[in-house]
Amino acid sequence: GLFDVVKGVLKGVGKNVAGSLLEQLKCKLSGGC
């Protein structure tokens, strides 16, 4: 139902946020920012 859709969207957003945070961390560690 609707709750499943919302949960799926939140999971997708969470994955995107985690991915971008990891990218920023890698960037800082490699000094390439």
Swiss-Prot record:
GO terms for cellular component: extracellular region. Disulfide bonds join 27-33. Keywords: Amphibian defense peptide, Antibiotic, Antimicrobial, Disulfide bond, Secreted. InterPro entries: Antimicrobial_frog_2. It is found in: Secreted. It holds the Pfam family Antimicrobial_2. Expressed by the skin glands. One of its GO terms (biological process) is defense response to bacterium. Antimicrobial peptide. A mixture of Brevinin-2DYc/2DYd is active against the Gram-positive bacterium S.aureus (MIC=15 uM) and the Gram-negative bacterium E.coli (MIC=15 uM). Belongs to the frog skin active peptide (FSAP) family. Brevinin subfamily. This is Brevinin-2DYc. It comes from Rana dybowskii (Dybovsky's frog). The lineage of its organism: Eukaryota, Metazoa, Chordata, Craniata, Vertebrata.
